[in-house]
């Protein structure tokens, strides 16, 4: 339904395939003159990545290498990649007053999901070193949340927002609990070194994240490749969100 709605706004080719099928991926680049790639495709459940690491390395890292290889070979000039703040692992702050993770922090992931994304970043950066026409923006997302606040039922454009199956993200689980679609919300861990003892996370609204990707395309017209954090620079604890 989303694809059908989008095609009413502007016609485009929708091709459904697995990025591991390199020859099929390459054929897309051969048959279309592509200037920009925005690469979202990935698995993203941290707990699952610990249990099934190879699933994440194959899908997230190897498949990213496939699309980077094709993009560089067939003249793509702008490559936007959705990475994750999980690449930072457990950051060490220099002082109690410092609570913001910046791009200068060491990338030291602590799970296969974060590792698979960091390895993908290296694939992109290494290719850019040998192909000066291949520019990239890497976005390290913090916790993406929310839904399009301007959406109206029956609108021509599709609604964007959180939709996971199974649902594991905090804000949707809280909302479902409030709507009595769940019995309760469970807090895991109340002994963190934070004011209320619960984990603090930075968030970013889906609308702002979408805008960031458009800005990245424009950015690469005049600037060199770079990596950016995608968050608001301040966090909220689990109890604060509730």
Predicted segment positions?
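Hydrophobic, Gly/Ser/Ala-rich alpha-helical and linker tracts in large acyl-processing enzymes
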Residues: 148-168, 176-177, 183
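Short, functionally important structural connectors and interaction interfaces within domains
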Residues: 11, 42, 93, 99, ...
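C-terminal substrate-binding subdomain of Rossmann-fold SDR/epimerase-dehydratase oxidoreductases
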Residues: 1, 170-242
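Gly/Ser/Thr-rich beta-alpha loop segments that engage phosphate groups in nucleotides
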Residues: 91, 116, 148, 191, ...
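N-terminal Rossmann-like NAD(P)+-binding domain of SDR-like oxidoreductases, especially those catalyzing
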Residues: 1-147
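Short aromatic-enriched loop/helix-cap "lid" or pocket-rim segments at secondary-structure transitions
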Residues: 2, 92-94, 148-159, 199-200, ...
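Short-chain dehydrogenase/reductase
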Residues: 55-57, 99, 110-118, 160-172, ...
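A generic fold-level signal
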Residues: 7, 51, 59, 131, ...
